[in-house]
């Protein structure tokens, strides 16, 4: 048994050295001595307007130090910066057309490549809205040797949404959202973080919302089915208080950590002799 014990220790040492070299290479890949975070998130938030994506996304961003890519905001930013893709998108929008999936996916890829916040992963909000978009996103991520971890759907009854949205307040620059009744800002009509003014969107009224919800349900059902088949879809009851929704999200993330810990210890456990 002495020989076997020595051999196990020798192999464990080799594995430990390999793990150290992998971490060093990952650090160099990130550019310098920055250590790659053990926690990284790659997820999509699915949910109708008013489900709470704008409330939960900043919390996820803070937890993982990742980027929040709300496609509408990203599109406006690219147009304002006059990037190549932004100029192309503006030309299409000025002509009354819809920006192509390839352009939007190109913008997401550009953010993942160049936005330092995306080193900790990303939250996609507002995309994909169709199955071809979901397939295009998966293809782009595969080319980066990545894949989505979660497609989390915030589910809520339409009637409750109407009451939620008609009192919604938004901080345009960040996408943070508040509610006059359910989640009011600390100072009236003022963003808690920046102190900048909040707005109420012109389409946040009952009739406009019902039309938006009908469109949302028609578009989103096939996308939800797509991610359900891949095994990464999970649903959360968004009718709960925001704090409870956050606890449900944390339970999903804690499940990731448990899986990673189990996978990481798998090889060493095989080399460790049973008592």
Curated annotation (Swiss-Prot):
Q: Write down the superkingdom of origin.
A: Eukaryota
Q: Which keywords has UniProt assigned to this entry?
A: ATP-binding, Cytoplasm, Kinase, Mitochondrion, Nucleotide-binding, Transferase
Q: Which reaction does it catalyse?
A: AMP + ATP = 2 ADP
Q: Where is this region: NMP?
A: 70-99
The record's EC number reads 2.7.4.3
Subunit details: Monomer.
Q: What is this protein called?
A: Adenylate kinase
Q: What is the lineage of its organism?
A: Eukaryota, Fungi, Dikarya, Ascomycota, Pezizomycotina
**Quick one: which gene encodes this?**
ADK1
